[in-house]
Each structure stands twice: as structure tokens, then as C-alpha cells.
From Swiss-Prot:
It is found in: Cell membrane. Part of the ABC transporter complex PstSACB involved in phosphate import. Responsible for energy coupling to the transport system. Belongs to the ABC transporter superfamily. Phosphate importer (TC 3.A.1.7) family. This is Phosphate import ATP-binding protein PstB 2.
Amino acid sequence: MACERLGGQSGAADVDAAAPAMAAVNLTLGFAGKTVLDQVSMGFPARAVTSLMGPTGSGKTTFLRTLNRMNDKVSGYRYSGDVLLGGRSIFNYRDVLEFRRRVGMLFQRPNPFPMSIMDNVLAGVRAHKLVPRKEFRGVAQARLTEVGLWDAVKDRLSDSPFRLSGGQQQLLCLARTLAVNPEVLLLDEPTSALDPTTTEKIEEFIRSLADRLTVIIVTHNLAQAARISDRAALFFDGRLVEEGPTEQLFSSPKHAETARYVAGLSGDVKDAKRGN
């Protein structure tokens, strides 16, 4: 078995957040004996955007993947603590496919399936049998329209998605994720490989999604985090250094590591620690 749980269950009372939609509770995890995250506790409010920030290797992407159980099959993966979705441990879901319907994920680079544009949008809808077949086209049109891609593809729904531009492929993947009506949307640097125009379009759309979803985004782009998120969190060396309202974290951080990072001076964790 690739995934091993260490220690007992943890209680949600350790998380300082009012009825979060999702929460990590004393989460520690690692691979092959190396600790990657250490005692992380934080809540993600419903209908809000939370940005996860930190230098490369800080643990933020591993944390995001854990929220979707993407690390389960990685050799040597061990964890203790818990992650709660609506108060229920995500590790107690036997049907991982259903869990991932509720917690969708968009990756750094587009990953369309090797099937038609239409079939890409409907892949999850078919797998979960969400609507009758006669409603398939309506679902596809609604989601493609929502992400601003319908006009560009409506006359070539049977085409390969690999004929689309990189930005269009990412929008297609977003439409596919939203087609199964997730409650939480995880985004792993979704605009890092895109042009400024498509980036702006996706950022605006992310903000609109917060009206109905819990959105959690990993980003190295400080300006992006400031623009789109309601809350932000900073990771350093596997630790959650600070989290709170985005404006507060940028304008009056509580920790020296945070101050250095938002000022663009980070990169050496040891140097940041000397400033404490």
C-alpha cells in the first residue's frame, strides 16, 4: 500500500476558522522518511478564494495535491493529522472518484484527454451519470459558454482538443472540471504557461467562481495573489508561516519571513529567519 496513516484521528477544533468548507488539521506528511509538511492547520472558507504562496520546495503544491488525494499512490507516502471536507475526513472516502467530483483540480499545464472537445467536457458527466444523454449537449454548451470558449469551438466540437491553443486547452480543462459541479476547486498555478490576455480572463473567472465555490490556488505570482484572493497563506520549508486576509498579509504581515516574501526579498529561508 503506497499511502500509510501515522497516529490517530485529529479534531477539527484545532482549526482557527468559522465552519470552513475544507480544513487541514495538524497535517504532517512526507515521502520515504522525509517530512515535506509539518503540523499544518488552516481552514478554507466557503465561497472565497485562498492563495497558497511560498518559494519552490516550500510544500505548497504537495499540500494542494493532498487536498485532492493525489499523493495516495506515491511510494513511501505517509501522513498524520487530517483534512476535512464539510467536517468529514477526506481519507475516509472509499469512492475516490466521487470525492474528486466534489473537489476538482486544474493543473499548471493543460491536460486535455485524447478525445473530442465535446467528449472532454462530458468525461466526468458520463462517468458519474449526472444527467440523461439527451442533456449532454446542453451541459457542454453551458460550461463552454461559462468559460468563454463556446464561440470558438461550437462548430468543431468533434475536433481534437490538441488543435486548440494552450490557453484554449486550459479553458477546456476548466470547463471539464466544472461540468461535474464541484464544491471545491483546486488550482495549481493555472495561468503560469498562458499569455497575459488569457491569464486576465481566467483570473476574472476565478473571482466570479467564488460566488458559489471554495477556490484554493497555488501561485508564485504575488500580484496575482493580491488581485484575486480573499485570503492568503505563506509556506516556508514545509511550515505554514502565516495565513489570513490577503490585504492584511501583504500590508501588515506578522512574521519576518512573510514580510521578506511579499517584498520580493525571499528565497533563502535561513536569511528570513535571522530577521525574526
